[in-house]
């Protein structure tokens, strides 16, 4: 199968040529794209949305960026509010790039409508949350190719320094050796994360929309955050290689389970006084909401056994936060990311010998690998910790999750100016969403 670059016309990288249209914003990620200004992007942004708290919260966040003391932005939001917001945007077309981050049940329909209309799409993940949505998304990618526009999702974790360096080290064959195959009981690639419903964003308590806890609108955990985890497995282990779902991916096991949300917790994070009717029908006998935000997938990727797992708690303990754990296993080295209490809830990178390999056998190859990184990442170092090595990462590379939205936006702007995505990116987006949605189908089937 031959993959070609997707062409996109009309952009040169000129100042202000990209005109954003934000459609039905309902998640704070829509605003994070605008936390900084971009020379290529016009300061005038067109917002189309139904009346309600979602768009109001979005506009407050943009206003917060415009009025902050340090490096304020200067966005000018032109807002249309009405039930016909989608039709109105498609008719007016004041911009050329649509920003999508909100209710995931509607998102895939928006993506397809935009692709059909010849509009570029820059979307938060997930771009679909079930098998029906995945079918629409696959059709949308085909329409985008036909109409010469680019659909792209925010894969912010590709800009996290520990992930970047993990990728560099596992692709250093002198250090890492061969990628291990693993097994269902002991996968060779593991990506796990823990998240929290109540958290702080840009220094303020995050207010989530009432529908966020309805998995038919937000999506279950196995199709939401796992999008990042599945993406990282492909991006790190098979860089710049197209993944074809039907040929390269086999779902072996999948499961889902709920986080129980009390009314007091729901009030705290949404600001609403009661569960809405669409959630009341899902409450248990004690009036508690089972929210299926947790999931696990065990699958093979080009013959390598991988596991992606996500868990949501309501709120992190004092001083704690979201966590991530990852390991990629090679014949000569295992490369870990750990982000727990021992790491002060900050992601840290480790290189450790697998069984049968002595620490001193790895030392020269690791030192050589770290020396080779100095041109791109000066200051990165290592220290022995008794189990292997801790990779020392200067603070200048730890810019934080919110800043990654600016980086992924810059990447997208470059692709627009280039007129194409990398040849592997669309096949891999197609494979990624086919993986997560098929896993959800299997998890539900296995419960019956």
Language-model features: where?
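C-terminal helical cap and adjacent loop that interface with cofactors, partners, or active-site loops
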Residues: 224, 229, 233-234, 241-246, ...
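A structural signal for well-ordered alpha-helical segments within the folded catalytic domains
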Residues: 53, 105-108, 112, 135, ...
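Short helix/strand-capping hinge loops at secondary-structure junctions
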Residues: 118, 124-126
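Rossmann-like dinucleotide-binding domain that binds NAD(P)(H)
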Residues: 203-321
């Amino acid at each position: 199968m031959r993959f070609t670059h997707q062409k996109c016309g009309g952009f040169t990288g000129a100042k202000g040529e990209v005109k954003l249209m934000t459609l039905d914003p309902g998640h704070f990620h829509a605003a994070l794209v605008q936390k900084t200004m971009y020379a290529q992007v016009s300061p005038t942004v067109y917002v189309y949305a139904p009346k309600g708290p979602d768009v109001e919260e979005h506009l407050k966040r943009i206003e917060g960026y415009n009025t902050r003391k340090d490096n304020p932005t200067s966005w000018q939001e032109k807002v249309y509010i009405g039930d016909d917001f989608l039709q109105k945007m498609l008719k007016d077309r004041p911009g050329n790039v649509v920003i999508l981050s909100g209710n995931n049940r509607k998102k895939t329909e928006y993506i397809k409508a935009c692709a059909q209309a010849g509009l570029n799409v820059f979307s938060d993940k997930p771009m679909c949350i079930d098998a029906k949505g995945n079918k629409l998304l696959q059709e949308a990618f085909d329409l985008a190719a036909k109409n010469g526009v680019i659909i792209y999702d925010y894969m912010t974790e590709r800009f996290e320094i520990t992930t970047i360096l993990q990728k560099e080290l596992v692709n250093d064959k002198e250090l890492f050796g061969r990628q291990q195959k693993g097994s269902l009981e002991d996968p060779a690639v593991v990506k796990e994360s823990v998240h929290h419903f109540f958290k702080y964003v840009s220094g303020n308590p995050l207010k989530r929309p009432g529908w966020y806890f309805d998995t038919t609108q937000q999506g279950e955990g196995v199709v939401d955050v796992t999008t990042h985890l599945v993406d990282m497995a492909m991006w790190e282990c098979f860089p710049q290689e197209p993944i074809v779902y039907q040929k390269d991916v086999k779902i072996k096991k999948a499961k889902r389970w709920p986080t129980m949300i009390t009314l007091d917790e729901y009030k705290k994070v949404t600001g609403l006084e009661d569960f809405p009717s669409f959630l009341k029908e899902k409450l248990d006998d004690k009036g508690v909401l089972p929210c299926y935000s947790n999931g696990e997938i065990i699958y093979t990727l080009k013959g390598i056994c991988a596991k992606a797992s996500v868990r949501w708690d309501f709120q992190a303990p004092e001083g704690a936060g979201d966590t991530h754990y990852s390991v990629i296993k090679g014949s000569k080295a295992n490369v870990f990311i750990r982000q727990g209490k021992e790491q002060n809830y900050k992601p840290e990178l480790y290189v450790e010998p697998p069984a049968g390999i002595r620490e001193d056998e790895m030392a020269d190859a690791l030192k050589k690998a770290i020396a080779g990184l100095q041109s791109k990442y000066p200051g990165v170092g290592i220290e022995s910790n008794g189990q292997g090595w801790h990779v020392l990462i200067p603070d200048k590379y730890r810019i934080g999750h919110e800043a990654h939205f600016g980086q992924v936006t810059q990447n997208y702007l470059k692709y627009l100016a280039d007129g194409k995505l990398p040849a592997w990116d669309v096949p891999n987006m197609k494979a990624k969403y086919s993986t997560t949605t098929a896993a959800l189908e299997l998890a539900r089937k296995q419960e019956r």
